[in-house]
């Protein structure tokens, strides 16, 4: 299943990422010396294509470009051997990790902002990511990994996993828990970005893109640590196989190239047909409606819970990630995205418009029809590929 493509103009290569039969991400590199794109031209242009025209009957020609557009890239992929195409486009389910963070709360107004708040003139009115990440929960298959900054004795770990399995007992769960304690926030975030994310094919969570992932990326850029006279920083670009973060147009967040990151709340909003009246998109409401379970209740503030009852705090963090996993197990919205990508033979990053909160209908239509366009000698012309769906 095709994830993404990236043209490296310096080396004249096309990088293609896809999911292999093991559910992991693999990269292929193809030589592409002179990428071309179609543009409209005059009837008497000597370079006009002898056969192809635009959908509205205009003559077209191909010109050399530094960066190929989406259609040119798909045309290149379609020209590969059947063996190569099958390997890239064949449907395989990626390994998926459900993630949730908890942050320090020092403001009575609630959770800290995940990004700077700006006025209409671009001036920062409230700084984002001002407080530290206290814990991260990661759920994969039957494994729960908790990252934290406090000691957690074995008996506490035993109670947390016992209570978690009891809370989800109707699913006959048998989760195993691993807790990793870090010296400080820097070490935790460094390990997350440098050692964990590179092993994850697909990351998701609830309101994950607009909060958790955004907070993690922005916060990581603020952290520094001196060890033996040397300053260390965290570069969130290491989360990408090609060390590149792509800014998603009209949003605050950036997505690592060649890695799948989805917001399961967005998938629910787009794909769910079970709840006729969507009164809320909060996890508490949706999990109750879809799987009959809610978030863990606690008294007082979440910050107070962290300070006074670390065990319940980490239990709460773990359950939040498991709730999203169980919504996925029950509804599997993400399989719709996988199927569209595989059937239409387009990048999975083109299936969803993360900015507009809907399906990327234009890209999907192009994928479904592009072979018909070719048979009918029609070329697709892009005017501004940066702002496509």
Question: Residues of each region from the PLM?
Answer:
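Conserved RNase H-like, two-metal-ion catalytic cores of nucleic-acid enzymes
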Residues: 3-9, 13-20, 25-44, 72-202, ...
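Low-complexity, highly charged intrinsically disordered N-terminal segments
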Residues: 54, 59, 93-97
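A structural signal for short, well-ordered beta-strand segments and their strand-loop junctions
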Residues: 98, 203-207, 212, 261-263, ...
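Short, flexible loop/turn elements at secondary-structure junctions
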Residues: 101-105, 140-142, 209, 266-268, ...
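Conserved DEDDh/DEDDy metal-dependent 3′-5′ exonuclease domain
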Residues: 148-278
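A broad, structural surface signal
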Residues: 190, 194-198, 210-221, 266, ...
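C-terminal or mid-to-C-terminal helical accessory/interaction module adjacent to the motor/catalytic core
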Residues: 271, 278-310
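Common nucleic-acid-contacting/processivity interface regions adjacent to the catalytic cores
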Residues: 301-389
């Amino acid at each position: 299943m095709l994830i993404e493509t990236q043209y490296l103009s310096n080396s004249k290569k096309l990088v293609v990422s896809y999911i292999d039969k093991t559910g992991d991400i693999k990269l292929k590199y193809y030589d592409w010396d002179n990428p071309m794109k179609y543009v409209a031209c005059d009837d008497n242009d000597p370079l006009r294509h002898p056969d192809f025209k635009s959908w509205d009957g205009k003559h077209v020609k191909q010109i050399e470009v530094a960066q190929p557009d989406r259609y040119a890239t798909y045309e290149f992929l379609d020209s590969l051997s059947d063996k190569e195409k099958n390997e890239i486009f064949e449907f395989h389910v990626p390994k998926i990790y459900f993630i949730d963070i908890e942050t320090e709360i020092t403001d009575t107004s609630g959770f800290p902002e995940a990004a700077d708040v700006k006025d209409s003139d671009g001036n920062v009115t409230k700084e984002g990511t001002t407080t530290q990440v206290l814990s991260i929960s990661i759920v994969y298959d039957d494994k729960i990994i908790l990252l934290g900054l406090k000691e957690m004795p074995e008996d506490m770990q035993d109670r947390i996993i016992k209570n978690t399995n009891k809370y989800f007992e109707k699913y006959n769960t048998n989760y195993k828990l691993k807790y990793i304690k870090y010296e400080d926030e820097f070490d935790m975030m460094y390990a997350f970005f440098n050692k964990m994310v590179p092993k994850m094919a697909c990351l998701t969570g609830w309101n994950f893109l607009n909060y958790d992932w955004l907070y993690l990326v922005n916060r990581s850029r603020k952290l520094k640590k001196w060890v033996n006279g040397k300053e260390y920083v965290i570069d969130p670009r290491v989360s990408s196989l090609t060390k590149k973060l792509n800014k998603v147009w009209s949003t605050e967040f950036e997505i690592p190239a060649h890695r799948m990151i989805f917001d399961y709340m967005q998938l629910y909003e787009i794909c769910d047909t079970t709840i006729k009246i969507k009164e809320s998109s909060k996890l508490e409401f949706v999990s109750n409606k879809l799987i009959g379970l809610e978030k863990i209740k606690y008294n007082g503030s979440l910050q107070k819970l962290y300070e006074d009852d670390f065990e319940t705090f980490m239990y709460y963090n773990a359950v939040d990630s498991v709730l999203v996993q169980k919504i996925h197990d029950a509804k599997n919205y993400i399989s719709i995205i996988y199927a569209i990508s595989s059937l239409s033979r387009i990048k999975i990053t083109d299936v969803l418009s993360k900015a507009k909160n809907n399906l990327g209908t234009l890209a999907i239509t192009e994928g479904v029809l592009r072979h018909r366009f070719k048979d009918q000698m029609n070329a697709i012309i892009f005017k501004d590929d940066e702002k496509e769906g």
